[in-house]
């Protein structure tokens, strides 16, 4: 999980 990939993934998880 990259820094830029972690942002959208975290938003999709919520």
Curated annotation (Swiss-Prot):
Origin superkingdom: Eukaryota
Protein localization: Secreted, Cell wall
Main location: secreted
GO CC field: extracellular region
Swiss-Prot/TrEMBL keywords: Cell wall, Secreted
Keyword Secreted included in the entry's annotation: yes
Protein name listed in UniProt: 44 kDa cell wall protein
Source species of the chain: Solanum lycopersicum (Tomato)
